[in-house]
Design a protein with these regions (language model features):
Chain A
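A short helix->beta-strand "capping" segment at the edge of beta-propeller domains
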Residues: 1-20, 54-56, 110-113, 290-296
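WD40/WD-repeat beta-propeller blade N-cap
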Residues: 16-23, 61-68, 111, 116-125, ...
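Loop/turn segments within WD40 beta-propeller blades
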Residues: 26-32, 72-79, 129-136, 178-189, ...
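Conserved strand-to-loop turn within each blade of WD40 beta-propeller repeats
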Residues: 38-41, 84-88, 142-145, 195-198, ...
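WD40-repeat beta-propellers
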Residues: 44-49, 71, 91-96, 128, ...
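Solenoidal tandem-repeat scaffolds enriched in leucines and small polar residues
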Residues: 110, 115-227
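C-terminal interaction modules of eukaryotic adaptor/scaffold proteins
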Residues: 294-297, 301-372
Length: 378, 651, 346
């Protein structure tokens, strides 16, 4: 009887990005059919799936006057729209213009027009994200000087017009943000999580005060929008995260009563945020406790700073990447425990030099590392 | 992804569920990396830096690496298995629903057999393909065959032990059948020898192995027939063994005797055999001696033949038959331990699964079958059927029953996996839908993101979404279709999909686009649609306005000027016209004002005048003056006519 | 003999299935077209018994013709030639060898991007054929009349509909009827150049698509249309106004309809809800005089009075296509299977 467990489980495909500098972000569109990349070379590129597993470059343009940090897609209900943010202190909204007799169209190139340039920030804009579509066409940016800005396009047909709805100062450098994707507006008010990469000095810690919350050394803040006061307020600060944060991401809600937030800091963390019922929460001095937060997982396997955390579509797998030049996949088991299910590494196998890169678009099978301890049985 | 198993501490602790490490090709990432998820199981790894200060980089660090899971079930042959088993799975869910009110075990058994026949057909297809294939392709197919042989074997045993209705729970006949079916060792030789029916068959090199094999498989009659073909078959020694085989008591629930009574006659028969053996009459025939020892359930005899078989399953049936034929189906653990212990070789994965099954440790069985690389097909379907049969109980460390959670998690994962496939998505959806509420929430996320390249696909997605009452998905697909038509400037398609999605915002957007198109090109798009649309026109004010405006065009074209004029006035006075459309609306009055017969009453004319003054900014001076003049002239002639009283029924 | 149903899994969702007519012997071969897969194709199959002595026949693939996009319609232009519409906007005429069906299909004509949104792709959603002529429709709302003999576009009705067209049927050589995504039906004189329909009416008030249209084999003025809602509508085109009779039939969209070629009273329908029904339509075609002396037709209000039979237990997935030849019916479904139903009484 042969071996029942397979050794080849993954296939890989290399794409030459052809950016002239470091790539900072890769974002897929709603359908996973288009991919946008941005880089320190100040360019943004859009790649389209050719339907046969390959990717074709369909647009490439100089988008900013500085490194482009992040790129993100709007919901397709609003058309083909992306937003970028940059070291040049701006964020920009781009729209693809439908098939025209433009010069590049024969070559399969498409035109993206800058519809709006958001210039309110005085420092580098570190992250940009479109809001959940049921809130309308919303955009949030954050900047190195710690200001969160929420913009709205009142007329979705007119992407040139964005009004700055809210400006929320946080007093610490903000590196990343994530919208809570919960669709239930009744149960969950609009919610944002932001992460700070402020180094841990005593000064910084002391300065993190204000609002109505008490001093908190945490690096992740939760903001919620109140319909009644029409304001965004900081409703929590996750004291469990004390180290600078590089990335955060809410998992899809799937109708749960709680939210899961992945945090990339000195380790990979998964934090369960459970809203506490109004009646039980209201204190007498107005300082209410909104959430019960619990670190459900903290993984130090990267042995280094973690840069990125990213959920798959259904929130069942979390990918993380760190300074160890490895990507790890974490999966929730049926009893809600999380464990690592795969590691992707660059380490060359001794005595076996991997094939040189070829700019092809077919998938090739990947071999598992020749390490007997990784195989369950033989 | 099915690379994992659950993390509950396994009682055996045999397996180390370490994550697998994969080596990225190309050595392309020297520094930091980032990652981004695409659709389904695809994600991208890219080189990434957090440093603000630009550092010169080598362009070698400039590759994206797309990684995707390799899914065996997506190969064409296995897609048949996926589709066919989906039908059986859905029937099983119905049967389980029915089982809530009445016992439905017979139906479950029928469905379990159906699953096995699906596996059998799949194996036949794989063998047929493997016979034709070459190279890597052949190797792959052979490894699939190995996988599905094991699955068939385990499923069958599971069916015997947990699903089948066995009279008195006496498992032996079923166990023998299982051994014969899956480990048909020596069967061919036996058939050959019996077919030839020649005296002196012992010349065949496998003669004795075959005879012993038949005994071990419990085919006593075949063994006796073979013994008769021996050239010394008529000798006393042979007759003695034949007699012992013939007189062996066979236990049957319907035999009318109790286990106790049976045990007495069995013991008696064994004593007889023992005395024959100790009388040393068989000393000249060591093979016959071996057979006698085997039928007496002698451990060392079994041990001595163990090496002739590839696995201990081959001798399991014989061992039970000759040591404890009255065993009930949940009393096989000891027999399994005895047989497995006869030879100290490395354990195979199948060994572990069969052992766990015979010991009744279903938790461990499921844990083990999750390691099979069939993308969870087997674990999902087997767990589901055992769950519905009420045979599966799994406790967590707090002794809470988590069986349904285990079942759900497997189905959810399998369903999501299939939903990634271009064609199998509808199969995946039916799995997710059978697992509410989370299944439907997941289905919602995936379904909404299904790439839609044709309207036929959109309509199919909407039909499926409606089937499972995922109205939000249906509406979202419509709105996205609307947006796509809008950005391409196709007003008809945009209006149609906005109305189909009953979306107020989208229909208002589409209507604005149509009106804007008219102001620029003087052609009103989608008139066929607007003139036949029903209550959907009420979705938004703009759409309603557009519809009425279109009707105004129709009336004007058919030269029903009076009606056209009335409609136009009502559009002007209703004030739902968008700002940019006032110019058009006001100028549309001009030809009607200039018509031979006055069509606006004086009141109408006043209304238009009022609007013109209120909205003077929408018209440039020259046009406004022209309109004022026409209005004044019309006022003059209508006032005259109305004053005469010749004006017939104004409204 | 009772109905015999036999399913075969083919690893492709089948969008269209068609018997290949034979002259003197029982039909054995058929076409399938697939959809919604990474690689779609048109296949030729034959029915054969793997073992001589066995009665059971299984489909065996004879040839495969790969196409881009989904196969949206297959209709015969001649005995051995089919017109195929594809979701990439192409229309092809393919020929199967009369003598050796195993021989690969030969391409006779190929209209690339016949339906299009300029540079962007647009689905050719269906076509109909009549005496060698082909009428095609697309999501672009255009109608094209092609000659299947000369391979040329004879006439185009640009913007026949502002929405996408989903079904088409030749009423006569010079007249076609189209149905759009909203159930808006239009009749076109293909000789006319004014791009205006000669008549237009709605399938139902629900604004759902007209998924298929056929006419009665012996009374071509009787038109039947299937709706996305599962309803079936009948018109008598001799009437000036178009009184329609609408039956709520299937629980989801009607995917294909066919009158039995040998018995015009038998109608077969299949649906997205996985049902395959036979209808006794005898009553429908018996016209009677109404109270005002006008020719009335049988209202289809009650489908029970129509004698509807379900031929197979409903599948869990959509049945997309059916084709009947004497006592045998072929079905293609979204569960990646084809079904052969034998001993059908007609």
């Amino acid at each position: 009887m042969g071996e029942l467990t397979a050794t080849n489980l993954f296939e890989s495909q290399t794409i030459l990005a052809d950016h002239k500098d470091l790539i900072h972000d890769v974002a897929y569109d709603f359908y996973g059919e288009r991919m946008a990349t941005c880089s320190s070379d100040q360019y943004v590129k859009v790649w389209d799936s050719d339907g046969n597993g390959g990717w074709r470059l369909t647009a490439s343009w100089k988008a900013h006057h500085g490194s482009v940090w992040k790129v993100t897609w709007a919901h397709p209900e609003f058309g083909q729209v992306i937003a970028t943010c940059s070291f040049d202190r701006t964020a920009a909204i781009w729209e693809e213009v439908g098939d025209t007799a433009a010069s590049g169209s024969e070559k399969g190139l498409r035109t993206w027009l800058k519809r709006s340039n958001l210039v309110d920030s005085r420092t580098s804009v570190t992250d940009v994200k479109f809001g959940p579509k049921h809130l309308g066409l919303l955009l949030v940016t954050c900047s190195a000087d710690g200001i969160i800005r929420i913009y709205e396009a009142p007329d979705v047909m007119n992407l040139a017009q964005w009004t700055l709805q809210h400006e929320i100062p946080t007093k610490v450098s903000i590196s990343c943000l994530s919208w809570n994707p919960s669709l239930s507006r009744v149960v969950h008010p609009p919610m944002l999580a932001v992460g700070s990469d402020e180094p841990n000095t005593t000064n910084a810690a002391a300065s993190v005060q204000g609002d109505k919350t008490t001093a908190c050394n945490g690096k992740v803040f939760i903001y919620e929008y109140s319909e009644s006061s029409r304001r965004w307020t900081r409703t929590d600060c996750l004291s469990s995260v004390q180290e600078p944060v590089n990335d955060i991401a809410f998992a899809p809600n799937l109708g749960r009563s709680f939210h899961l937030l992945a945090v990339a800091t000195k380790d990979v963390r998964i934090i369960k945020i459970e809203p506490i019922a109004e009646s039980a929460a209201s204190g007498n001095n107005g300082a209410t406790v909104r959430f019960k937060c619990e670190v459900v997982a903290a993984f130090e396997e990267h042995y280094s700073c973690v840069w990125r955390v990213c959920w798959n579509l259904t929130g069942t797998l979390l990918a993380s990447s760190g300074d160890d030049c490895a990507v790890r996949l974490w999966k929730m088991q049926y009893l809600n425990q999380w464990k690592c299910v795969a590691v992707f590494k660059n380490e060359p196998v001794p005595g076996d030099s991997p094939p040189q890169s070829r700019p092809h678009t077919t998938y090739i099978r990947m071999a598992t590392m020749a390490n007997p301890t990784h195989m369950p049985f033989h | 992804m099915n690379t994992s198993s659950f993390a509950v501490d396994s009682s055996r602790g045999k397996t180390v569920d370490a994550a697998k490490t994969f080596v990225l090709p190309d050595k392309c990432f020297q520094k930091h990396v980032g990652c981004a998820w695409g659709r389904g199981n695809k994600f991208t790894i890219y080189p990434r830096s957090q440093t603000v200060n630009k550092t010169p980089t080598d362009t070698a660090d400039n590759k994206l690496l797309n990684i995707k899971q390799d899914i065996l079930l997506f190969t064409p042959i296995l897609r048949k298995l996926v589709n066919e088993s989906n039908g059986t799975y859905l029937s099983l869910q119905k049967a389980a629903e029915a089982a809530k009110v009445s016992d439905n075990q017979v139906e479950f058994l029928k469905l379990s057999r159906q699953f096995r026949s699906i596996i059998r057909v799949c194996l036949e297809n794989l063998q047929e393909a493997a016979a034709k294939a070459e190279g890597i392709e052949k190797n792959n197919l052979l490894s699939y065959i190995t996988i599905f042989y094991s699955i068939e074997c385990i499923w069958h045993l599971c069916e015997i032990l947990y699903i089948d209705n066995i009279p008195g729970d006496i498992v032996l006949p079923y166990l023998l059948e299982w051994v014969r079916f899956h480990f048909p060792c020596h069967e061919q030789t036996a058939a050959q020898l019996l077919g030839a029916c020649e005296r002196g068959s012992e010349d065949h090199e496998d003669y004795w192995d075959t005879v012993v094999g038949m005994v071990v498989q419990g085919r006593v009659d075949v063994a006796r027939a073979l013994l008769k073909l021996h050239s010394a078959g008529e000798s006393n020694e042979f007759k003695l063994v034949d007699n012992s085989l013939r007189s062996m008591p066979v236990y049957s629930v319907y035999g009318g005797i109790s286990t106790g009574e049976f045990t007495i006659s069995w013991k008696h028969w064994q004593a007889e055999c023992r005395s024959k053996l100790s009388s040393r009459v068989l000393a000249s025939q060591p093979k016959l001696e071996l057979i006698m020892k085997i039928i007496m359930g002698d451990y060392s005899a079994f041990e001595s033949i163990r090496s002739k078989y590839s696995s201990w399953f081959d001798i399991l049936g014989g061992w039970v038959m000759f040591t404890a034929p009255w065993s009930r189906r949940h009393e096989l653990g000891a027999a399994a331990a005895a047989c497995a212990g006869m030879q100290a070789t490395g354990r195979s994965h199948l060994d572990d699964m069969v052992r766990a099954l015979l010991e009744g440790d279903l938790h461990q069985v499921i844990h083990e079958i999750q390691q099979i690389s069939d993308n969870g097909w087997f674990a999902t379907h087997l767990t589901d059927i055992l769950f519905h049969c009420g045979k599966l109980t799994i406790m967590d460390k707090h002794q809470t029953n988590v069986t349904s959670r285990l079942r759900d998690s497997l189905i959810l994962e399998y369903g999501c996996l299939l939903m990634e496939h271009k064609s199998l998505w509808s199969v995946g959806l039916s799995y997710l839908a059978s697992c509410p509420p989370e299944g439907l929430r997941r289905a919602e996320l995936i379904l909404e993101r299904m790439p839609v390249d044709t309207e036929a696909k959109a309509m199919k997605i909407i039909a499926e979404a409606k089937k499972y009452e995922l109205i939000g998905v249906a509406q979202s697909v419509c709105r996205c279709m609307c947006a796509r038509h809008l950005s391409a400037g196709r007003a008809g398609g945009a209006l149609c999909w906005a109305m189909r999605g009953r979306s107020s915002a989208a229909s208002s957007r589409a209507a604005h686009a149509a009106l804007a198109h008219y102001t620029q090109h003087a052609v009103l798009p989608a008139q066929d649609l607007l003139l036949t649309a029903g209550s959907a026109m009420l979705l938004s004010d703009t759409l309603l306005f557009l519809g009425k405006y279109c009707d105004f065009h129709r009336l004007y074209k058919t030269r029903e000027f009076k009606k056209a004029a009335q409609l136009l006035v009502s559009l002007i006075t209703s004030k739902i016209a968008p700002e940019y459309f006032w110019e058009t609306l006001l100028l549309d009055t001009l030809p009607l004002l200039e018509s031979d017969e006055p069509v606006f009453t004086s009141n109408d004319t006043y209304e238009i005048m009022l609007c013109l003054e209120l909205r003077s900014s929408s018209l440039d001076g020259e046009k406004a003056d022209l309109l004022r003049l026409a209005l004044a002239r019309n006022l003059a002639r209508t006032a005259l006519a109305e004053g005469d009283g010749t004006e017939e029924g104004a409204q | 003999m009772p109905l015999e149903v036999q399913g075969t899994f083919v690893s492709q969702k089948i969008s269209k299935i068609r018997w290949i007519a034979e002259d003197y012997v029982e039909t054995k071969c058929f076409f399938t077209g697939s959809w919604d897969d990474d690689q779609n194709s048109i296949k030729v199959w034959t029915l054969e018994s793997p073992h001589e002595e066995e009665e059971v026949e299984y489909p065996r693939q004879l040839s495969e013709y790969l196409v881009d996009g989904d196969v949206t319609q297959i209709k015969f232009t001649e005995k051995n030639k089919i017109a195929v519409s594809l979701s990439n906007g192409d229309v092809r005429v393919l020929e199967v060898s009369l003598y050796d069906k195993q021989f690969p299909l030969k391409e006779v004509f190929h209209w690339k991007k016949l339906h299009n949104y300029g540079a962007e792709q647009c689905s050719c959603t269906s076509l109909d054929t009549l005496e060698g002529d082909i009428a095609t429709i697309g999501e672009d709302g255009n109608v094209n009349i092609l000659s299947g003999r000369r391979g040329e576009v004879m006439h185009t009705i640009k913007g026949a509909d502002s929405c996408s067209l989903h079904s088409i049927c030749f009423i006569k050589h010079t007249e076609v009827i189209t149905g759009n995504v909203r159930g808006h039906m239009k009749i076109w004189d293909v000789r006319s150049t004014n791009n205006k329909p000669s008549a237009a009416f709605l399938l139902a008030g629900d604004e759902l698509a007209a998924t298929c249209i056929i006419h009665h084999p012996t009374q071509p003025h009787i038109i039947l249309a299937g709706s996305e809602s599962g309803a079936l509508a009948v018109w008598d085109l001799r009437m000036n106004s178009f009184p329609t009779s609408l039956v709520n039939a299937h629980s989801a969209g009607v995917s294909e309809m066919q009158f039995h070629p040998e018995n015009p009273h038998k109608l077969l329908t299949c649906s997205v809800s996985g049902e395959l029904w036979e209808w006794n339509m005898e009553a429908m075609t018996k016209s009677s005089k109404g109270p005002d002396g006008q020719v009335m037709w049988m209202p289809l209000q009650d489908k029970k009075s129509m004698m509807v039979n379900s031929l197979i237990p409903a599948l869990h997935k959509s049945i997309n296509s059916l084709h009947c030849d004497k006592g045998r019916i072929l079905c293609g479904a979204d569960n990646e299977a084809i079904y052969l139903i034998k001993n059908f009484k007609y």
